């Protein structure tokens, strides 16, 4: 199930008109579950950054945008998806995992695990790049279109509040394998994220 689906052009218009979060809230509440204030605030913040990312003439107006895609047979929700064609008309899907983290720390004794402040305390969670890559893997296994057509899946993480000069540990060499296949973009790297999408 996809909570919101449109073109890049309509996504930006919905954001600029102030109706995007309302549409997300209404659809998710009607079809799935109640939405808390913290999730609404999270959408407002992260999607403003994604609207800025998508305001690039090199990203086609008719590129597809999906928000809050619920992977079938799971409780996993993909934050942001961009779909489109390259210059050779090959289909591409870019999965973007959005985080508002300000700080995180490496965990050396577990693969692709980091620790960060969540829910009032420090918690161990998957590295955001690994989380995005795992969604690609799930979609490859559960989506018939991806299985039956030559659609290329790409993943990345966008931590728009994350200042690597203060908290550099998410790029520790222990995470190189996942960062090489699912890059991470942080505060001040919006142009790099745009280039990855293009």
Task: Enumerate the predicted regions with their spans.
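Accessory nucleic-acid engagement/destabilization modules that flank
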Residues: 1-198
């Amino acid at each position: 199930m996809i909570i919101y689906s449109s073109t890049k052009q309509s996504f930006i218009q919905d954001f600029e008109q102030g109706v995007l979060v309302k549409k997300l809230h209404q659809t998710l509440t009607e079809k799935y579950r109640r939405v808390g204030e913290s999730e609404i605030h999270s959408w407002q913040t992260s999607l403003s950054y994604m609207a800025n990312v998508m305001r690039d003439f090199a990203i086609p107006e008719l590129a597809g945008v999906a928000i809050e895609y619920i992977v079938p047979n799971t409780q996993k929700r993909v934050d942001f998806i961009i779909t489109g064609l390259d210059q050779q008309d090959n289909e591409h899907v870019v999965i973007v995992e959005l985080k508002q983290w300000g700080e995180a720390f490496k965990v050396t004794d577990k693969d692709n695990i980091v620790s960060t402040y969540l829910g009032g305390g420090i918690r161990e969670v998957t590295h955001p790049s690994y989380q995005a890559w795992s969604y690609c893997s799930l979609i490859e296994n559960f989506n018939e279109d991806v299985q039956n057509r030559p659609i290329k899946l790409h993943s990345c993480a966008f931590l728009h509040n994350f200042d690597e000069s203060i908290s550099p540990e998410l790029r520790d060499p222990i995470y190189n394998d996942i960062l090489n296949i699912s890059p991470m973009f942080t505060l001040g790297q919006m142009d790099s994220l745009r280039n990855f999408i293009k």
